[in-house]
Amino acid sequence: MLYTLMHRDTAVMDLELDEYSNIVALGKIHHAEHLPLGTYNKIGVERKSLNRWWTKRSIPASRRGIRDVLDELELSSPQELIEKCFGLSLSDQYWISPTDKPLDWHKVNFFENTFSEDIGNILFGKGRSSGSASLISPDNTANGNLKKKWKIIDGKRVLLKGSSAPYRQEAYNEVLASEIARRLCIPY
């Protein structure tokens, strides 16, 4: 499938994804200055580097509960989830727009628009709301090993995190580290 890598509403470059959401071909560069860090060098864009960046946007295969999500959705890898939500995230403003049916950033981004909680609910063992699961979710691009899901609470985007056995302390450690940084006036 052919896409344009976008940075908000700026076209960055054209690319092609295979059926497993791997970048198999690079096309025209529209705005090299908007390419993700680490994907561009003196020679140009390296497909390998861009693929690594793209893959790291996905939920790691080692995350607890991801196999349940993939089985329920009949997908073979977490990377396939990225394409289903156009690579949209609440961590940055990169995404992909189909070249045959371009999308508008302001109508699809998760900063301004609602999103499905189905993937996050499945990851937390709650199952989907009803019918087929909606894949338009920032949970598809919430990388890291802790289970997590995005939720809109009183109009704010909030990241809910779980912890892992045996001590289940990772999320508490993050809160403690944030509080220490705040008290020491360290930007975080």
PLM feature spans:
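Phosphate/dinucleotide-binding and metal-coordinating scaffold of catalytic cores
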Residues: 1-188
